[in-house]
Curated annotation (Swiss-Prot):
Presence of the UniProt keyword Protein biosynthesis in the record: no
Full protein name: Antizyme inhibitor 1
Classification of source organism: Eukaryota, Metazoa, Chordata, Craniata, Vertebrata
InterPro entries per UniProt: Ala_racemase/Decarboxylase_C (IPR009006), Azin1 (IPR031178), De-COase2_C (IPR022643), De-COase2_CS (IPR022657), De-COase2_N (IPR022644), Orn/DAP/Arg_de-COase (IPR000183), Orn_de-COase (IPR002433), PLP-binding_barrel (IPR029066)
Record keywords: Nucleus, Polyamine biosynthesis, Ubl conjugation
Site (Not modified): K69
Family from the record: Belongs to the Orn/Lys/Arg decarboxylase class-II family. ODC antizyme inhibitor subfamily.
Post-translational modification: Ubiquitinated, leading to its proteasomal degradation; a process that is reduced in presence of antizyme OAZ1.
The organism of origin for this protein: Pongo abelii
Length: 448
């Protein structure tokens, strides 16, 4: 099955039964070693299709609006658009990206908490009416620049207020909601619903209980003031595991039945991001420099070998000014795998991993145990599909890694069963035979 050909900026390889993603990574490591290329990603688009099927099976009553800033790679957006998800956009560029795919404006939400006036005007121009708001100043800005705006009032959760610094800045209190609703009435701004967000790091199911209870209170307040609200956005916070999704559904499903029952006219939506893409992308990085240091130079409390053994600092060709940008604000939740084969009884050494910038902030892994590696060896990082695809920094002449998209035949058939056809995908699929050894000339990739 050689698929179809269109003038596109990327290709997607179809893997036969004898080829897996490990084989693909091996081939590209070989190619990049020969040509001295940069780090690269391999994206398994079939995993995105599987995540959507999982979502439909577990929480079919909640419509997903994919958070574009999480990963705006064109192949990702095209697959999700073909699957029928909505999109949560934070900027004009993101809105334009998804509208170019034919996504109707009603399937787009403008979720930036701090909106530029020019971008509010752009949303008005292209018909993106649904947006979020959590304060009076933002509400007035919307009123002046978007006459058809339909606003979701963003309320804080106990999770936000309780100490997660990245989220506590956004979302209004329940106490302040009546004031904002009255302001909206005076400004003639239509409030159509409520949004809240619970972090994926939150382990307390009671946070959802309180958030949904608060949302119901806001709906009741709005009714008293004269608004008819019809949308509830339960935010993101989905890690990507079926277990976590089922756990969340176990908590919220009975509450939704009580507070927003079927037939109430309230549409339930969510903003999954990393849920869809995290596990779909693997990053391969090359070691470009190495230092031998004393073991006691590593901070106490980290995983170390004996003090009389050497420790190593390895510098890679990607770091926080590239694909590991999220490391600046959160801990890395993936452990590197050594690509080369080594013996089971080979000694392990205390090691730290760094990006290429020589900046003290550019530390990727503080401490881990690895066999001794050499310059030119490769490390593989799984679960790198979320927050890794930002514009490359000019720091240290960083270049964006290539992305090689793949999918198994079984996933391709599953995609067709889901209603995605070649015409709707507009992709250039090609067949990847088993055990193929790729060279520079017969490479079938395209840079993102």
């Amino acid at each position: 099955m050689k698929g179809f050909i269109d003038d596109v900026d990327y290709s997607v390889g179809l893997l036969d039964e004898g080829t897996n993603l490990g084989n693909v990574i091996d081939n590209y490591v070989y190619e990049h070693t020969l040509t001295g290329k940069n780090a690269f990603f391999v994206g398994d688009l079939g995993k995105i299709v599987k995540k959507h099927s999982q979502w439909q099976n577990v929480v079919a009553q909640i419509k997903p609006f994919y958070t574009v800033k999480c990963n705006s790679a064109p192949a990702v957006l095209e697959i999700l658009a073909a699957l029928g998800t909505g999109f949560a956009c934070s900027s004009k560029n993101e809105m334009a990206l998804v509208q170019e795919l034919g996504v109707p404006p009603e399937n787009i939400i403008y979720i930036s908490p701090c909106k530029q006036v020019s971008q509010i005007k752009y949303a008005a121009k292209v018909g993106v009416n649904i947006m979020t708001c959590d304060n009076e100043i933002e509400l007035k800005k919307i009123a002046r620049n978007h006459p058809n705006a339909k606003v979701l009032l963003h309320i804080a959760t106990e999770d936000n207020i309780g100490g997660e610094e990245g989220n506590m800045k956004f979302g209004t209190t329940l106490k302040n909601c009546r004031h904002l609703l009255e302001c909206a009435k005076e400004l003639d701004v239509q409030i159509i619903g409520v949004k809240f967000h619970v972090s994926s790091a939150c382990k307390e199911s009671q946070v959802y209980v309180h958030a949904l209870s608060d949302a119901r209170c806001v709906f009741d307040m709005a009714g008293e003031i004269g608004f008819t609200m019809n949308m509830l956005d339960i935010g993101g916070g989905f890690t990507g595991t079926e277990f976590q999704l089922e756990e969340v559904n176990h908590v919220i499903s009975p509450l939704l039945d009580v507070y927003f029952p079927e037939g109430s006219g309230v549409k339930i939506i969510s903003e999954p991001g990393s849920y869809y893409v995290s596990s779909a992308f693997t990053l391969a990085v090359n070691i470009i420099a190495k230092k031998v240091v004393e073991n006691d130079k590593f901070p106490s409390g980290v995983e170390k070998t004996g003090s009389d053994e050497p420790a190593f600092m390895y510098y890679m060709n990607d770091g926080v000014y590239g694909s590991f940008a999220s490391k600046l604000s959160e801990d890395l939740n993936t452990i590197p795998e050594v690509h080369k084969k080594y013996k089971e009884d080979e000694p392990l050494f205390t090691s730290s991993l760094w990006g290429p910038s020589c900046d003290e902030l550019d530390q990727i892994v503080e401490s881990c145990l690895l066999p001794e590696l050499n310059v030119g060896d490769w490390l593989i990082f799984d679960n790198m599909g979320a927050d890794s695809f930002h514009e490359p920094s000019a720091f240290n002449d960083f270049q964006r890694p290539a992305i090689y998209y793949m999918m198994s035949f079984s996933d391709w058939y599953e995609m067709q069963d889901a209603g995605i056809t070649s015409d709707s995908m507009m992709k250039n699929f090609f067949f990847v035979p088993s055990c193929i050894q790729l060279s520079q000339e017969d490479s079938f990739s395209a840079e993102a």
